[in-house]
Curated annotation (Swiss-Prot):
Claim: Cytoplasm is one of the keywords in the record: yes
Cofactor(s) of this protein: Mg(2+)
GO cellular component, one term: cytosol
Name of the gene: rnc
HAMAP family referenced in this protein's UniProt entry, alphabetically: RNase_III
Binding of Mg(2+), residues: E59, D127, E130
Organism encoding this protein: Mycoplasma genitalium (strain ATCC 33530 / DSM 19775 / NCTC 10195 / G37) (Mycoplasmoides genitalium)
Catalytic EC class: hydrolase
EC code: 3.1.26.3
The name this protein goes by in its record: Ribonuclease 3
Amino acid sequence: MKNKVLKLKNNKIFDKKLATFLKNLDIFPNNWEFFEKAFIHASYINEHEDVSESYDRLEFLGDALIDFVVAKKLFELYPKYNEGLLTRTKIEIVKGENLNRIGMELKLGDFVKLSNGAELTENTVGDVLEALVGAIYEDMGMKKATEFVEKYIFERTFSEILKYDFFSLFQEQKLPEPRVRVSLTSNNLVLSIIELDGDIIWSQAIPNNKNYDDKSVLEHNAMASFTSFLKSSKGSHFFSDLKEKIENQKMCKKLAIKPKKN
């Protein structure tokens, strides 16, 4: 991917393009220096004496902020996750490959300042995403940085990971794809049901303490609860018992339709 040639931070054309770009991300800077710095690669400094700092420090800050916001979001949204599942899910969201992908999707590379001979890599774009989060925090505070991370990093990634892990559990056991159903009862309970070929194989009813009414969040909670259940001692034999039950049902059907011998 070839990087666009951009001029110094005081260039009005650059400022206008960057302002439009940030506006589309719902970012309206108070201090432009943070955001201009967020796109300056270390190699650029070597060729421009009037530029003294790259995005490295902002990247360091943004990395820590992303890690914290994602951890806090997982902890609050999914109370049924144990420590191991929380950690594994967080790693999938904040890992470099994922941040690189999101940075590329957001087209952050269009604004990166590199030396003339440097190549723009996906890793650099991921670093810039972290630096941008750091810039948002420095200029606009924790609330805005949290909103950005939740919208552009957490929400873009988590549902994909959760669904993949959930359905993979059944694929690994060579079972059909399950169906997840959720509903709210009149006494504010969340009723979660998982079906396989029309049969209910797991269900739970828990208080809706957070007053969620978003169906996708409720479904995510149901998947998380089921996954956590499988990792508990009670769920350790779930699939073996389920498969045995399915085989017994098949056998009963076979016997029921078997013709009588003359």
